[in-house]
From Swiss-Prot:
Xref: PANTHER family: 4-DIPHOSPHOCYTIDYL-2-C-METHYL-D-ERYTHRITOL KINASE, CHLOROPLASTIC
Reaction(s) catalysed (UniProt annotation): 4-CDP-2-C-methyl-D-erythritol + ATP = 4-CDP-2-C-methyl-D-erythritol 2-phosphate + ADP + H(+)
Underlying gene: ispE
Pathway the protein acts in: Isoprenoid biosynthesis; isopentenyl diphosphate biosynthesis via DXP pathway; isopentenyl diphosphate from 1-deoxy-D-xylulose 5-phosphate: step 3/6
GO molecular function terms attached to this record: 4-(cytidine 5'-diphospho)-2-C-methyl-D-erythritol kinase activity; ATP binding
Family that this chain belongs to: Belongs to the GHMP kinase family. IspE subfamily.
Keywords (A to Z) from UniProt: ATP-binding, Isoprene biosynthesis, Kinase, Nucleotide-binding, Transferase
Organism, as annotated: Bartonella bacilliformis (strain ATCC 35685 / KC583 / Herrer 020/F12,63)
Top-level taxonomic group: Bacteria
Catalytic residues, chain numbering: 20, 148
Biological function: Catalyzes the phosphorylation of the position 2 hydroxy group of 4-diphosphocytidyl-2C-methyl-D-erythritol.
Name of the protein in question: 4-diphosphocytidyl-2-C-methyl-D-erythritol kinase
NCBIfam families for the chain: ispE, PRK14608.1
EC number: 2.7.1.148
Length: 304
């Protein structure tokens, strides 16, 4: 399933790509090839970048939007690599495509923007080319594009939060997890994921223990999160001390629980409902007009 925003013309449509949020992230080891082993509670919102697709005679990729500056339309861009990956993997089914990506999410911000874009392109082409390939099969193959791409594919397919282990390839769907209202805040400093992982002083932290039953309501979820961590926060804070101000601002705006997502620098706050989240987002934006602030609703069951 894809989050379809518009289907105005045959074959032409727009989707909003997934935002990935690590509500908890425990680093529990490291493989000999350098990949870190993690355990993470991951939620998603289909309110990210805007991706437009249309069939065409020759491949085309266009970048626009407030966060497109400095990005390229070549193989350095993960979204372009995803398109090229599909051409190489399914040459007999491949057809030219035109993609326009409006970047509305900060780059290098710990919310999987690039991975969500890539997963959306994989998912679109799987459907448009009518491939005899399941989401699970494509997710396994797409690990070559990055550890976050498979989980974003699963988010598009199943519309549920996930418990993720290993290097991102061991995924469990959390079917009972409720949808939550959140506010995302980014103060503007880019943080390279590799830099944060290299700065880790310890790579064998205690595992993440989550009882799926506790994810059914916002209040019980918040209680569970109090006993979890983001093991990347301490090294990120040393690089970007402004993170402390962001988290403090979220708390002041009424957040029930605030934390940095992934390797940063985006932080999130959990709120009791959408109205509270929207009110908090407006408050934070008025106080810090240069910050990225976004109110979202995550995928999941209704908690009502």
């Amino acid at each position: 399933m894809i989050s379809t925003v518009q289907d105005s013309l045959e074959g032409h449509f727009h989707v909003l790509t997934p935002i990935k949020l690590n509500l908890a992230l425990h680093i529990v080891g490291q493989r000999t090839d350098g990949y870190h082993l993690l355990e993470s509670l991951v939620y998603f919102s289909l309110s990210g970048d805007c991706l437009s697709y249309a069939p065409c005679e020759r491949d085309r990729f266009i970048l626009t939007g407030p966060f497109a500056k400095g990005l390229s339309c070549n193989s350095i861009n993960l979204a372009v690599r995803a398109r090229d990956f599909m051409h190489k993997t399914f040459p007999r089914s491949a057809k030219p495509s035109s993609f326009q990506l409006m970047k509305t999410l900060p780059v290098a911000s710990g919310i999987g923007g690039g991975s969500g874009d890539a997963a959306s392109i994989l998912n679109i082409l799987r459907q448009k080319w009518k491939l005899d390939c399941s989401c699970e099969e494509l997710a396994e193959m797409s690990l070559a594009l990055g550890a976050d791409v498979p989980m974003c594919l699963f988010a598009l397919e199943y519309q549920q939060p996930l418990f993720v282990k290993g290097i991102g390839n061991d995924v469990t769907r959390l079917e009972e997890a409720c949808s939550i209202a959140m506010v995302l805040v980014n103060h503007g400093q880019k943080i390279a994921t590799e830099t944060i992982f290299n700065a880790l002083e310890k790579r064998n932290h205690p595992p993440l223990k989550i009882n799926p039953v506790a994810l059914k309501t916002v209040s019980s979820l918040v209680e569970v999160l109090q006993e979890t961590r983001n093991d990347l926060f301490i090294p990120a804070l040393k690089i970007a001390p402004q993170l402390a101000e962001v988290l403090s601002t979220l708390d002041e705006s009424g957040s029930l629980f605030s934390r940095m997502s992934g390797s940063g620098a985006t932080c999130f706050g959990i709120f009791k409902d959408q109205q509270a989240a929207q009110k908090a987002a407006a408050f934070i934006k008025s106080m810090h007009p240069n910050w990225f602030v976004k109110s979202i609703i995550t995928l999941g069951r209704s908690s009502q």
